[in-house]
Amino acid sequence: MTTAINEAAKRAGSEPFYNNLQQFGRIWRALVIAQFADSFGPYPLNSGSGENPTFNSEKETYRFILDELKDAVNKIDTSITPTEDQAKCDPAYGYVADKWQKLGNSLRMRYAMRLTNTDMASEAKAEFEDACKGGNYIKSQSDMLWFKSDNGWNDYTSPYTRTWNLQALSSTMANLMTNLGGVSVAEQRADLAEYTKPNTYLGYKYDQHFVANTDNPTKQYWLDGIPENLDPRALKMFWLVNDTQAENMIDPSSKGTKINPEGSELLLDADGKNTIKISGSFTWNGVPSGASTSWSPTLSKNKLITTASGIRSCYPLWGKEYCTGGEEGLGRVVFYGAWESYFLLAEAAVRGWNTAGVSDEQAYGDGVRASFEYFGVGEYADAYLESTDYNRVGTSVKFTHTTEPSSFEATYIDGYTKQEKKVTYQYPVASKTLYGVALNDKLTKIITQKYLAQMPYLVQEAWSDHRRLGLPFFDLTGNESVMTGADMTELKPNSWESGQSWKYFPQRMRYPMSLLTSDEAEYNHALELLGGNNTTMIPLWWSLGSNQK
């Protein structure tokens, strides 16, 4: 891709439109290079030049990205209007110069913020402030960078349209959205009221079938219903099993699953015999982290999460528009959303940076509203932003509400005896989280909301925020064995007891082995710049892990 961009830049010529075209290409190239560098690490900046690629450090790469974006934006002539035929060649913006300029500034804000843990932090601050000072960045849906998608086999194929993928709600996402914002499910969908459960109820506990070795505060519970209060975006993102009235209903058969409303025999006894039927109909549960990472004595008896049919028939799945793609709405693949600019400004303001008069609270609220508008739930935004209710990991929405959560008495049902019992619900211990500061401070709120808004297309950005800040709260993999032969050898069965570490979360993607076979010298050079072996656990230069190792 960078080869084509470089070639286009060479051929641009001096005609004003083609000068703009060159700058648009440079902005797109910067985005592509950043995606590579944020996935793998060191990148060859002379890639696509016709020379043998030579890897550069991550610092050099980011310096190049920021310089390119600034220079390209400054060289765009916004007075140039493309012809109709020219506009057809740009599926994103139709070569509208002002939109590309906003994208360039927005990306500059994004990548400057990436460097807060590095020796370029002061430069990052200056870059960010310069990019946002004129207010010329992406603020509305009309300026967003997104593309149509479909479920075929072409350049517009959506990443979520493959029927064999297990695209189910995760335990992390379920905990974040439960009770967040205090908006009742009954208000959102009156027909779902009968399935709701009070916030103080945790569900059925199956401690013989779900792993205990994790810091997930809802571990081993199966909620036999929907939370009383749920973030309004949840039911737009995910389809509840057997919810035939949902606008985002998917055809279960398209996922290779026949759903049994009465439940499937999925929890086994020690002899491997079917013992308990579980129904996923109208329930809100997330697949536990690490459910398929290593052999587990406990999970070997749980077909609910160790089989594809169990997951697809019992857990909420990404809704119809994600599965089919589309030219409008949620089916479009987002590369930069309006909400991201606002959450970047909010974080910058919290850090004390100059955000051109935009306060942290204002930017935070605008980010939430932009996300709600995108998901079509804008009518709930005002009440949501005033909520002081905590989600399952101890974070509330209201920006000025920074009181840390306290444990509370909850009820549950023993899954084996069917007896109702009480338990003290414990939120994660703030000092033991990867962030390590608080569960409900302003930065946690900002990144929690940013994470939810970025779903599902901007997962790389969400991953980058987690690697950089340790936010939002990701529960540790429920691990019952030493993962011999895997990259995550530091994560032992009892690691969760002492708290989180960056060593327990993947930090990067591996370079493909084709690089080794095609250019062994540069492969070794890249690893030298990376500072470690070609594994997923080597922290990138800008990450929290690199700062702590």
Predicted regions and their residues:
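Structured, solvent-exposed acidic/aromatic patches
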Residues: 1-344, 348-374, 440-441
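C-terminal functional modules
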Residues: 300, 305-321, 325, 332-342, ...
